[in-house]
Amino acid sequence: FGLDSDNVIRIGGWSAATNRFQMDMAGNLTMAGNITAYSDIRLKENIKVIPDALSKVQQLRGVTFTRNDTEDLEKLHTGVIAQEVEAVLPEAVSEDNDGIKNVAYGNMVGLLIESIKELKAEVDNLKTQLENK
């Protein structure tokens, strides 16, 4: 574990081949494993399916953008806009002490799963209608 001369924090070794975790000054996080979150049903209460998921997804935009707060101003990124997510799924958005909004992308997975299920139901309904003609 340590801070290397190139300002990279590493755990597990001093090269990409032996690193288990690496965070650089640009804010990039690389690891050998997965990012996980507790999801055990024993830790959850008041479980409800997300209603109208497809209509919520339709209110979001998948966008490309460049950032104005990094050294690499030309690098193209993809993602969503926190304020737009907050309007339809506020539990996926937080705000830091400086008022900068953050998106917990993992918290959007449930919404996407339910919207796919809604689309599947629509497709199945259309198939049935076509078969019955």
Which sequence ranges carry the predicted segments?
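C-terminal intramolecular chaperone/autoprocessing and neck/assembly modules of extracellular spikes
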Residues: N19-Y105, L119-K133
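Flexible "stalk/tail and boundary" regions
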Residues: F1-S15
